[in-house]
Amino acid sequence: MVAVQQQVQAAIDEFVASGADDGLQVAVLHEGRVVVDAVAGTADADDVKRVDPSTLFFAASTGKGVATSVAHVLVERGDLSYDQRVADVWPEFGAHGKDGVTLRDVLVHTAGVPGLWPDITPGDLGDWDRVCAFIADQPPWWPPGTRTGYHALTFGFVLGELVRRATGRTLAAVLREEIAAPLGIADELHFGVPAQLLVRVARQGPDGAAPPPPEPGSPLDRAIPSGVQPTAAFANCPDVLRADVPSQGTMSARAVARMYAALLGHIDGIELVSPDRLATMATPTVSGTDQVVGIPTTSALGYSPARPGGVESRPGSTFGMIGSNGSAAYADIDSGVAVAVMRNRIVGDMSAVAAIDRIIADSLG
């Protein structure tokens, strides 16, 4: 296992030395044991503060995998069910024919409510009630359950409000109390970073090879309006980092990898979900053309079922999420690995993750 650590360390050192990245963290657990805990580069724009294992990174949609995991834990414990209708606990959401939308629809992005208002600002994301009221009153873009389309930001609000109404706790509170605290990672896995921990957040660097903004008025532009697109300025905004938005998260690699390892059942006797539940979570469920992004997509129950670096995935075994800033966290049931990669440069490619994933696949499966 020493060789795996050395190979990953050499790879991320090269990414920093080449200028492709400013700072990275990588954590890998295999059957519950840490086999990689590697860092490289700097955490600030002045190249002074070094990345360490406790550095927190804005991880964009990698956070969706964390939010999804909270939902599955709540289903496991009987607090939610996949076929529970959102409107049963959030009546306002049922407007405009959305009364049949279920938790399952939310998880696989078939609910039909991906849009936000055009001039939304980063500060608006912290106004939970306003955003939820807007979504509840939004006519669906398609008959719910009939098509899929990436709910880039609204995913976390719909899921979070369902959790809040059903349990009396925010999704962030459930994450902290039921998952992060028992696993000893409560300071490193966040929806809404506490003010006193903002100093530990790596500053995202220039937008590098980030993809161009969506065409004005396009479905993607309506789902991610210009004011809340994932640029470096957005990711560094204190309002964004402090906001409890379960569509995106701030975390360390070792924390989110430990969470995925716990889902696999390999951490200190802590069983977050049963083996049967785990199999359900990882099973590809919905395929089709994404109505927001416009490309073919396949989803498991809230996760991507593909390995982020192009390594061949095993359907029903691999599950996780990637972020638009090049971060990723995922697990593989068959090989028993849980992997997380955090980066602090907004980039539009997954080259670092691909290189790391290839090392992991060749060494551990």
Task: Annotate each PLM feature.
Residues 13-29, 46-106, 143-153, 244-247:
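Short active-site loop at a secondary-structure junction
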Residues 53, 58-62, 74-114, 118, ...:
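Active-site helix/loop module of the DD-peptidase/beta-lactamase fold
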Residues 128-133, 357:
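Hydrophobic core segments within long, regular secondary-structure runs in both alpha-
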Residues 13, 111, 136-140, 160, ...:
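Amphipathic, well-packed alpha-helical segments that form the structural scaffold of globular domains
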Residues 113, 156, 346-347:
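Solvent-exposed loop/turn segments at secondary-structure junctions
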